[in-house]
C-alpha cells in the first residue's frame, strides 16, 4: 500500500521531497528549491500517519532510507548532497525546467 502511494506521489508531482520536519538537510533542500522558485510537493514523513511505511517503501524502491529523498520529473535524485551537487554542476535548474517545476 505504501509503495503504491509513494509511486503515485512521485508520478503525479513534478518535484517531490520526502522529508522530516526536524531534519536540517531537508530544510537545506527545501530552501534551495524555494530560492530557485520551484514548485514542489513536500511529504513530511514524521507527520504522516504512514510515514514509516513510506520511508520503508522508499528504501526498497531507491536503496535510500535517509531523508531528504528527492524526485524530479519522476526520477530519483537522491538526498541533500546529490541535490546540491546537481545545482553546483548547473544540472538542477534544467531538470526542474524539464519537469515543469520552474
Curated annotation (Swiss-Prot):
Residues 3-102 form the Glutaredoxin domain. The keyword Transmembrane does not apply. This is Glutaredoxin. Belongs to the glutaredoxin family. CPYC subfamily. InterPro entries: GLR_AS, Glutaredoxin, Glutaredoxin_euk/vir, Glutaredoxin_subgr, Thioredoxin-like_sf. It is found in: Cytoplasm. GO terms for cellular component: cytoplasm. Disulfide bonds join 23-26. Keywords: Cytoplasm, Disulfide bond, Electron transport, Redox-active center, Transport. Has a glutathione-disulfide oxidoreductase activity in the presence of NADPH and glutathione reductase. Reduces low molecular weight disulfides and proteins. It comes from Ricinus communis. It holds the Pfam family Glutaredoxin. The keyword Electron transport applies. Signal peptide: none annotated.
